[in-house]
A protein has these predicted regions:
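A short, Lys/Arg-rich alpha-helix, primarily the initiator
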Residues: 1-27, 72
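Short alpha-helical DNA-recognition segment
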Residues: 26-47
Length: 84
């Protein structure tokens, strides 16, 4: 199965998600947050740096729980602002 290329909007949304997760993580280590979320630190690193801009829903949900974020907050903070 061939994966279709990501759109610029999907890449931007992934970058916003990564930035939000980095901010929410603060001084806590990637390994600590990844462990609580049940994912690898490498997966978290890829999401935070935009190398995995479209993570699975349950991965995002687990990270939200580990970081004390609501899914609503993630949606609002990662939503694209329409061009004027």
């Amino acid at each position: 199965m061939v994966r279709t290329p990501l759109t610029p909007e999907e890449r931007e949304r992934g970058e916003r998600l990564g930035q939000l997760l980095r901010e929410a993580r603060g001084g806590r280590s990637m390994a600590d947050i990844a462990g609580v979320a049940g994912i690898s630190a490498e997966t978290l690193r890829k999401i935070e740096t935009g190398r995995a801009p479209t993570p699975a829903f349950f991965t995002v949900a687990a990270l939200a729980r580990a970081l004390g974020l609501s899914m609503d907050e993630i949606v609002v903070r990662c939503a694209l602002v329409p061009a004027a």
